[in-house]
Regions:
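Hydrophobic core
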Residues: 21-31
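Extracellular disulfide-bonded cysteine-rich modules/repeats
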Residues: 56-64
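Non-catalytic C-terminal accessory/binding modules of secreted extracellular proteins
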Residues: 78-84, 91, 97-103, 248-270, ...
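Bacterial N-terminal signal peptides that target proteins for export
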Residues: 4-20
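Zn2+-dependent metallopeptidase catalytic core
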Residues: 82-275, 284, 379, 466-472, ...
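Boundary at the C-terminal end of the N-terminal hydrophobic targeting segment
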Residues: 34-37
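Extracellular hydrolytic enzyme modules, especially secreted metalloproteases
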Residues: 86, 224, 229, 237-383
């Protein structure tokens, strides 16, 4: 969000209607010719998505519309909270329980896809404590001040958790001012190739043995019993530690044992230009008990599966963690559905209002409709981006990360609109190739990326499961109509 655009919460006193009218008349009458000409561009065609024309109290922004059009949208510089739409049913009616009958084995067997989550190492409701350790090695010396870097990242983690949990969870994160030197050499350790195998690849420590080796160094300075997990951030020079490690386990240490999270930040994420805080939040959400990784399909609509677009949490996962408040969800069962128009708040923005529309289709399926924007928690979206996504949740399906995303391998999937024919979004994309020995090549390329038929622009409709979903009007928020399909 640019610095000249502000979010005004409802607690701020609004100007009287009469004063607003008088002010508007004075402003318009005093506008120079150029400003009047710009005002007339609203709804007219434009060339570059994200282009802005600044006005006195508002601005024009070039955005997509239906039929591939690019037009100017008029947007105010102040964004106010919205009153939530009155939900026909309690949101708990759409909070379907898990209904998996034949559970798959693997790391994802102990995480949850629905409410209530089975708590892992972090409590999704209440207070938690964590230890961040910037760690370096004699053969991979750390550079710079880890305290300076972590201060910024930890602040972001606190802000994200406070907003998306509605203040229902907190984490106290401790970290040292300088690098902690490991007794091991980086060349003795590896996070490659297969962390799921208990045995170490070659003569290097990996997996549980790797975490235990690093915990032994930490235990000399910190009382591990005070923490629910330790997150290691290796020096960038430690090239053998380029892949993340995510383990919730009981680890052996020289002083006994430690039960909790043992994570290693995949420092190749710096090459991918990922935010450190977002990478860690994703891991924390697993530790709260979430399966994540659905809906995904390489679409940039949430921290559950990507760190390249919107970095908010979708309302289904929010609800599964017990973070949802009354008014956050417009819930209705399909048999009770009547035509309605609901104003949605983008999940990437800190704005009060209705966050999601949910339509219960059966005892195991629910449609979820959400709005997206480039905003505080979505700054990796391109300027001018907006849209409404729809995904289907099926609580009888367990994630199977060994197979491509589909209705039978993911509990949630975004729905593609077969009635539109948009281009793929052209954007920078990171690529990497790794051979059998773990040697990596990587870089960036600008090319068509994800399919924009997975989102609705203004005046577009999607028909699915007997429901018609239309984005009637868009601005700072999205006015969505839901009705039975004819």
């Amino acid at each position: 969000m640019s610095q000249d655009i502000h979010l005004r919460h409802s607690s701020i006193r609004k100007s009287s209607k009469a004063l607003a009218v008088i002010t508007a008349i004075l402003l318009v009458s005093g506008l120079p010719d150029a400003a009047v000409a710009n005002e007339k561009k609203v709804g007219k065609s434009c060339n570059k998505i994200g282009e802005r024309i600044n006005l006195k109290e508002s601005y024009l922004e070039c955005r997509w519309k239906s039929e591939g059009k690019k037009v100017y949208f008029l947007l105010t510089k102040i964004i106010e909270d919205l009153n939530p739409s009155i939900s026909p049913e309690p949101y708990t009616n759409c909070r379907l329980p898990e209904a998996i009958k034949n559970r798959l084995d693997g790391w994802n067997s102990y995480v949850s896809i629905a409410y209530p989550v089975v708590k892992s190492t972090l409590d999704p409701l209440g207070s938690n404590t964590y230890l961040f350790i910037p760690i370096d090695f004699k053969d991979a010396v750390g550079v710079g001040s880890p305290e300076k870097m972590l201060r910024t990242e930890v602040k972001k983690i606190y802000e994200w958790l406070d907003w998306y949990s509605n203040g229902k969870v907190s984490i106290q994160i401790d970290y040292p001012k300088s690098w902690l030197r490991s007794s091991k050499l980086a060349s003795e350790l590896t996070t490659w190739p297969d962390l799921a195998k208990p045995s170490s690849p070659g003569d290097k420590l990996s997996g549980i043995s790797l975490v235990e080796a690093l915990l032994a160094d930490v235990e000399q300075t910190y009382d591990l019993s005070k923490y629910q997990g330790v997150y290691f951030l290796p020096s960038l020079a430690a090239k053998s530690l380029e892949h993340g490690v995510f383990l919730n386990n009981t680890f052996k240490t020289p002083k006994g044992s430690f039960t909790g999270g043992g994570y290693i930040y995949g420092n190749s994420a710096f090459e991918r230009e990922e935010f450190v805080w977002a990478f860690i939040i994703h891991d924390f959400l697993h530790s709260f008990g979430l399966a994540l990784h659905a809906p995904g399909q390489e679409l940039p609509f949430g921290i559950q599966d990507t760190t390249f677009g919107g970095l908010g949490i979708n309302e289904w996962d929010t609800m599964s963690l017990g973070w949802t408040n009354d008014g956050d969800v417009y819930c209705v069962s399909k048999e009770n559905l009547k035509t309605a128009e609901i104003q949605l708040v983008p999940i990437e923005r800190e704005q009060k209002g209705t966050q999601s529309i949910m339509i219960k289709l059966s005892d195991t399926q629910v449609l979820v409709i959400e709005s997206h924007r480039r905003d505080k928690w979505g700054m990796k979206f391109l300027p001018g981006f907006y849209g409404v996504s729809t995904y289907l949740v099926d609580t009888s399906v367990q994630n199977d990360p060994t197979k491509p995303a589909s209705k039978s391998t993911r509990f949630a999937n975004y729905i593609k609109n077969t009635q539109t024919n948009k281009d793929r979004l052209v954007n920078r994309r990171y690529w990497q190739e790794t051979d059998a020995k773990g040697n990596r090549k990587s870089g960036w390329v600008t090319q068509p990326t994800w399919d924009m038929d997975y989102i609705l622009f203004e005046n577009e409709s999607l028909v699915t499961n007997g429901i018609k979903i239309t984005l009637k009007k868009s601005g700072h928020n999205d006015l969505v109509r839901i009705e039975r399909a004819q």
